[in-house]
């Protein structure tokens, strides 16, 4: 890619650690080309609407959020209805450490990227000063995490509680809490159509967001336009390489 100066959209997570992400930055700075990490949810109209609502002061000053992504993919039912956990197949990338397996790398990168995006709406964030707390991990037989939780505290005192799992149906909900109310997204990551629930002053308002197209289409259209316009970075709220590096630093600490 470097020799041919290819423009790159790479599936998440872009790398397995922040050191690899930094090396990509150095290489792409040399050839002055386009690179971004693929998080399709960031380009969906619901995320743009959430950003708009927060910036307009709909829920006041941001205090905290909680964000989850988890499905029980390891429990199987027998013919008689008994539940049994599946054996981990190390040939499956999800359960292979060298192939980037585990819930943190496969799913955790979603709520991490969203947490840093939302925190940055309060004030500019310094990734090196984000404090990690309440780390919890269940490690499976192949050495990868299966059920993991973490808390983030930013310099602006904004906090985020994150949970990801291969063993529990945590769902895909995000709740963002402000001084005047809260926003709830029931399916943050994958739905084409979605709802944003605003709760404030003992009232509930539901905003329906119609995707009108495949969830990946928003991402492809935005990035294609950036490339046509010869931009070196993707349009907001897509991730720059520096944001990818910063998010991977958080994941490094979570995995450690």
Where are these regions (language model features)?
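Beta-strand-loop-alpha-helix segment that lines the small-molecule cofactor/substrate pocket
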Residues: 1-42
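A general structural signal for well-ordered alpha-helical segments in protein cores
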Residues: 21, 47, 111-115, 193, ...
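Predominantly a Rossmann-like dinucleotide-binding segment in NAD(P)-dependent oxidoreductases
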Residues: 44-128
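A short glycine-threonine-serine/GTX helix/turn-capping micro-motif
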Residues: 98-105, 205-214
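Contiguous beta-strand/loop segments that form the cofactor/metal-binding neighborhood of enzyme cores
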Residues: 113-191, 221-233
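C-terminal helix-rich "cap/oligomerization" subdomain common to oxidoreductases
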Residues: 155, 222-256
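Short polybasic amphipathic segments
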Residues: 174, 192-201
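Active-site loop of classical SDR/Rossmann-like NAD(P)-dependent oxidoreductases
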Residues: 210-221, 239
């Amino acid at each position: 890619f470097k020799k041919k100066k290819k423009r790159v959209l790479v599936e998440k997570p872009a790398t397995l650690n922040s050191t690899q992400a930094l090396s990509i930055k150095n290489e792409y700075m040399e050839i002055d080309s386009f690179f971004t990490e693929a998080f399709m949810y960031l380009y969906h109209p619901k995320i743009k609407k959430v950003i708009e609502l927060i910036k307009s002061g709909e829920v006041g000053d941001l205090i905290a959020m909680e964000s989850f992504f988890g499905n029980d993919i390891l429990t199987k039912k027998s013919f008689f209805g008994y539940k049994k956990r599946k054996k981990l197949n190390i040939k499956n990338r999800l359960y292979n450490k060298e192939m980037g397996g585990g819930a943190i790398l496969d799913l955790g990168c979603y709520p991490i990227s969203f947490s840093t995006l939302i925190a940055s709406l309060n004030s500019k964030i310094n990734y090196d000063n984000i404090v990690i707390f309440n780390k919890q991990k269940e490690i499976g037989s192949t050495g990868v995490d299966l059920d993991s939780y973490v808390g983030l505290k930013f310099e602006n005192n904004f906090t985020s509680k994150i949970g990801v799992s291969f063993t529990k149906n945590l769902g895909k909900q995000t709740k963002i809490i402000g001084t005047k109310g809260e926003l709830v997204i029931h399916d943050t990551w994958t739905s084409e159509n979605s709802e944003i629930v605003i709760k404030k002053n003992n009232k509930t308002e539901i905003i329906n967001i119609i995707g009108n197209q495949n969830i990946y289409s928003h991402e492809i259209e935005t990035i294609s336009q950036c490339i046509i316009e010869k931009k070196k970075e993707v349009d907001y709220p897509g991730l720059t390489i520096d944001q990818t590096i910063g998010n991977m630093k958080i994941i490094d600490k979570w995995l450690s």
